[in-house]
């Protein structure tokens, strides 16, 4: 299913399509690997596979030339743009929620208002186990260095720009999915 949606929106932009697919495949693989280690969490792996491949579908609408994005929206809106796209495709709401709730370690209403972010004024934190898993896995891969997996320390540092309790939310996800032994 994800392939048809990507094919529809990513025509004539081979470099961006490559970035999207490579990044999304890395996120998907990590999420599925983690899910396989946690049968007790009853993670819907079929949904995770599809949703992880679509979580960044909205980058086509943002202005981020460094990663071949030549849209008009600010980059921070790629999640809500993706959610709008998936809703317009008639996908179940849970796919759209993954898109809009994976930025940072999720964004609270306070984060959005206090930082004056150009986002809807409501809580955008991941809630379901699948939303949390995809959000967590995404933090280990950037779209600028497709060949590198971040360490936990690098992932944590990349969250500093989101402020608030972002780091604490990420650590909670880490303890859920990859607890220290």
Where are these regions (language model features)?
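Charged phosphate-binding loop/patch that engages nucleotide di/tri-phosphates or the phosphate backbone
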Residues: 159-181
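Alpha-helical scaffold segments in carbohydrate-active enzymes
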Residues: 30-33, 139, 176
